[in-house]
Amino acid sequence: ITRAQFAAICARFDTGKSNGSRTFSDIKGHWAKAYIERAAELGWISGFQDGTFRPDAYITRAQAVTMINRMLNRVPEDPSDLLPSMNVWPDCSPGDWFYLAIQEATNSHDYRRKANSYETWTGLNADPDWTRYEN
């Protein structure tokens, strides 16, 4: 699935229309332009530092999880909002841009909502044995 296709799926969960205030240099004329712009306006997606979105590139796990978490307003602010006993993944380190998103999506937890809309984890829930999916 491409970044444009995934952005279109996510944007359809919102009934608003794009006002064109958030655009990218490489989406002019693209079939998903309005969806991409709407998802960006909602803060669900951001492009790359060069001002592009790369709509036809395949979406990565990290990008998809980040979009979903933002769409569901499930976002910890920094690693101190997590719990040390959480599941961790060998391909996801605290310095990675997607670390918080992956941890958020793969650890069932209770949380307290902070005033700035971020969340702080208050406890972990029993998780399935994720390691059975490795290899």
Named regions from a protein language model:
Residues 1-7, 11-35, 42-62, 71-135:
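Feature responds to low-complexity, polar/acidic, surface-exposed segments characteristic
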